[in-house]
């Protein structure tokens, strides 16, 4: 779930809490896709990014890396550097810092019609994909 950050849309970056169903966002293939559903839930287990402090995701989020999707739960309870997939550049090294919040914050899970993820503050973050036949 995305707790804090700006999702890349066809109109430019937009705060996650403002993303609505039907909106067009940019998927991990750098293609436009439609948001089919936005689910909201409280989160306490998080991953912070040392070089991207305005991005905060839940521990169960998928993170797009140079080598494929990394499940956030696999990040050990100490800081770990990963080569993260970006929209502007092929990849970028950043240090992932798992942690626990003092109080729960709202997180948002997006379901899109294609792409397996979206760009948030420049990094690829996994989301649900639901295709229609």
Region locations from a protein language model:
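Autoprocessing domains of the Hint superfamily
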Residues: 1-133
């Amino acid at each position: 779930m995305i707790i804090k950050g700006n999702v890349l849309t066809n109109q430019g970056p937009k705060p996650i809490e403002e993303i609505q169903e039907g909106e067009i966002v940019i998927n991990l293939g750098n293609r436009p896709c439609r948001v089919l559903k936005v689910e909201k839930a409280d989160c306490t287990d998080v991953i912070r990014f040392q070089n991207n402090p305005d991005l905060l995701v839940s521990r169960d989020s998928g993170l797009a890396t140079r080598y494929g999707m990394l499940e956030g739960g696999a990040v050990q309870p100490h800081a770990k550097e990963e080569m993260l997939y970006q929209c502007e550049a092929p990849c970028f090294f950043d240090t992932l810092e798992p942690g626990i919040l003092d109080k729960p914050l709202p997180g948002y899970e997006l379901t899109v019609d294609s792409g397996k993820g979206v760009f948030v503050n420049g990094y690829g973050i996994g989301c649900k994909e639901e295709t229609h036949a």
